[in-house]
Amino acid sequence: MIKINTLFHMILICSCMGTCFGFMEIIVAAGSYLYQKLPCFSGACCTKNEIPANYHALEASLKDKLFGQPLVLNTVVNALKSHWNDNYRAEKALTMSFHGGPGVGKNYVTKMIQEALYTQGTRSPHVHMFVARLDFPEVSKVPEYQRNLARWIKGNVTNCPKQIFIFDEVNHMPAGVLDAIKPFIDYYDYINRINFREVIFIFLSNTGAQIVNEHTYTLWRKGIKKDEMKLSDFEKLISQGAFNEKVSNRILVTTDLQFQELWLICVFYVLSQIRKVNRLLK
């Protein structure tokens, strides 16, 4: 606010003197700059400096640091690219649901997304993490949780539309909490004059591991290599809501991904090596 007051004083002095020897051009430029930065005085900035959305960095991180999840790389990067595309107007908020047992990389990938999209990464004021057992522990308080959650989303999206809301341990979340976000992820242009179409919602759940392991093994027995498996190979399970009923039955999910167990990947590798040895011995 000191900068703005100083600017006003300079304009007043120049007006009284009747001339500023070209200084007015500088004042106009400074005024334009400060005008663009005004939102930053009252809250978090919402420009490309704070939200660079570096998809190349995300792709590189996933390739270098994520092991054994071939379905994740292309699906996640493409979904984010198309959602925050300057030449494309998103029709609705992006909703991504990640399933799998502990330690398969769900939170790791979510962290990579935050670090690639935002300059401050996980510390960005545009990133919001909710953990079911910490933030929504009591079933009796579901109506209160719904009100607070809706209020929090509205307030932050009003300041900047490019927000990420992450819900961890969805399988432990009391039924009904996620109903609060339904209006924000539907095909509405505006709700109360607020645009929610650029928002990203990520749901993390520990369900579905056994189901996908069995299906992955079946595909492998049919001769489909793990790196050749596609998201379409799991669409039937997804359409049946086999992974997480608390999300699939309530939320229109844009991208649904099942993270595969790392021990299963090791088993596939060992079996493939045994097959190679057997072929050589024949």
What are these regions (language model features)?
Residues 154-155, 175-202, 206-210, 221-222, ...:
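Conserved catalytic/switch belt of AAA+ P-loop NTPases
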Residues 52-94:
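Pre-Walker A (pre-P-loop) alpha-helix and adjacent loop at the N terminus of AAA/AAA+ ATPase modules
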Residues 168-170:
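Walker B catalytic acidic pair
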Residues 17-40, 107, 111-115, 253, ...:
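C-terminal alpha-helical "lid" subdomain
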Residues 2-55, 65:
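Extended, charged/polar low-complexity intrinsically disordered regions
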Residues 211-282:
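Conserved AAA+ ATPase core "coupling" helix
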